[in-house]
Amino acid sequence: MKHLYALSFLMWLITLGSASAQTGRITGTVVTNDHQPAEFVNVYLKGTTQGASTDAEGTFELQDIQAGSYTLVASSVGLKSVSQPVEVRANQTTTVSFTLEVDGKELEEIVVRANPSLYVTDYPSISLRLKTPLLETPQNIQVISNQVLKDQQIFDMQEGVIRNVSGATRSEHWETYARIVMRGSRVASFRNGMNVTETWGPLTEDMSMVERIEFVKGPAGFMLASGEPSGFYNVVTKKPTGFTKAEASMTVGSFGTYRSTLDFDGKLSKDGKVLYRLNLMGQLKGTHRAYEYNNRVSVVPVLKFQINPRTSLTAEYTYQYVQMSPIGSSYSYSPNGLGDLPVNFSTLEPNMRPTTVNDQSLTLTFSHSLNDDWKFTSQLAYLNFDQVGQSLWPSSFVGDTLLRAASIWDILGVTKVGQFFVNGDVRTGALTHRILAGLDMGDKDYYHDWAQGGAITGASSFNVFNPVYGQVPASAYPVYDRSLDIRERGVRYNNQYAALYLQDEIRMLDEKLRLTLAGRYTTTGDADPYSGQVDAEKFTPRVGLSYSLTPSMSVYGVYDQAFIPQAGASFEGTPFDPIVGDNKEVGLKTDWLNGRWTASLAAYQITKNNVLTSDPEHQYFSIQLGQTKTQGLEIDLRGELVEGLNVTMNYAYTDGKVTKDTDGSFQGTQIPGTDKHIANAWLHYKFWQGAFEGLGLSFGVQHSSGRTAWYGAYDRTVDPSMPDYTRFDAAVSYQFGKMGVSLNANNLFNAQLLSGAYYPYSNFYYWQAEALRNYRLSMNYRF
């Protein structure tokens, strides 16, 4: 642990004489009359275009305000507006506090109008630890709001979430988890700021419990201990708001889809010190493939104890149950090529035993404001993923006949996470130091058993071009022995990590210029029966610079690192060094029309060194000569362009290539599983007055080209490219009073949409085909 002392060299003093300027800033908090933080409150200077909205802690910040006297106004739907005079002095910060009273009549009668909070968010969630507005953060962070998820009728992470962020694609389409690729590699999965990534997990969060989803592009030392340099996505679950309200919804759709949700939000004590949130969901869902289904139940209660105005404790329990068809059922197989079978082709039989998942987690979050400038937060979490089931895969092809095999697929994943961090501001003359310091710890145990199984015996031949179902007797399937606990019969993978992080965001020149100096020291330990124990440690620096050209436009640059421990050793017995990923990024961010819509442009280059490649002199061994380089351009736009028209639009160009290998034969090859061009758009227009008041119309398109399959990329006898992908969707909705109805149509033009590859080990193709045109009709009621 002597390397911990390396952190003492991370920060250094900066002496900079800043020119005198006649501007100051205003910061403050907004709470309700029962002392709860008020989120999404609009705070603005009357008679000007300068304003902001509060974050989840009720805090706000206005910068670059000309010195003088103003009237500061705070307003929000369901709260009585309040104003107060404020004096802004040059080179000083004015602190203001508001207490707003609930307007019961407005909450009861008002129909919430589209506003900048519906598609646009000013601040990251508390779980990302950053107090800095997104506009000023030197990193590409995109936030998908709950309203977007509702408009698109998304049920879980599998269903089109990635269309709302530039450059994201899915590499696998299993029903249990979302494997998302961005900037050339898989991104990590976070929930409420905690890394919950597993080899085949986590279970996808149902959107009924989700408040927002944050995509953080590139390495993020303030969150990631170790992992791919592509970034991560953070699912933020719903928390109590302090308002008493509820919402119910029912959905019916194609393929026998039936779904209901309930969302209750309110107070358990009259003084408002004990709050609750309860989300319930039940779902029966088939697919376009015969005998395939995914039925789910989720129960998510949250309790928040406001111990005093500065201290709170939040307890959240999540339970998700899934009963589904065997894993692997979503794939099609052919000896001839991709896509030469009908989209509804299935290898399933109607009498196959289901796979079940019980997913539970418990999270405790303690928050204490030491004073107006400093805050301490800690999180403890326990997650348990228990899967009992089987998988269905091809054994081989004999002509056009597919020989199918079933095997046990039991999993137990137990994750324990602890996080402790402190945020605060220190002012030294003309400089403000925004400090973030934290400790992350985690222990992940993962057991799997797929060692039992075999061919489906006694079955009649299964011709993929003329399949006949229902001919397999129950006795033909393998019988699995589960008499031993999976901890005894399964293969164990264990990952442990601990990391210290320290960051100083130095704000100068009236806080127009912001320099971030940070570093993380991480130790990891990985163990499995194949590679034994692999320990690694690494110090990763982070340097960022952001400058506000105007109050609504900033430019930034950032350098950050990530590392990935590697098991094994060379022929000489030398252990492999971790993969190191370096990210260099520059960008531009803008807010328009007082934050009603935002746009960002980012250019980056990620270089991964120490990648393993084959040893030319020793067969079956590897050496560390490999390198990949991914560079690209990302554009994101979201918000209300004109009154009533909310959009989410993005484009990404990704150029990922192998730049070094053993003999150079694969240099210049596109990184498997990447798409060169991805473009998405979603437009939602709502009429707010006139004969069509309450009517909403939506239209969306997803397109990607230059696609490369995961397998076969290094087999020169096979073309690894996949066909272009273009899908059109549309929706119509109507809101009348407290009730709303929405009809969504997906894949309007019945496009054949595929993702798959050639499997070189068995000489056949596998792919997944999306459904042709399908519908969802949803009704919701607020009370």
For every predicted segment, state its role.
Residues 31-33, 41-46, 75-79, 89, ...:
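Short, acidic, small-residue-rich periplasmic hinge/interaction motif at the N-terminus
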Residues 209-211, 222-299, 307-311, 360, ...:
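Outer-membrane beta-barrel translocator/receptor signature
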Residues 283, 287, 299-369, 382-413, ...:
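Acidic/polar loop-and-plug regions of large Gram-negative outer-membrane beta-barrel proteins
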Residues 308, 413, 432-434, 440-444, ...:
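Structural signature of Gram-negative outer-membrane beta-barrels, strongest in the C-terminal barrel
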Residues 367-381, 385-391, 580-643, 647-659:
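Membrane-embedded beta-barrel scaffold of Gram-negative outer-membrane proteins
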Residues 624-712, 778-782:
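Gram-negative outer-membrane beta-barrel transporters
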Residues 642, 702-712, 733-783:
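C-terminal beta-signal and adjacent terminal beta-strands/loops
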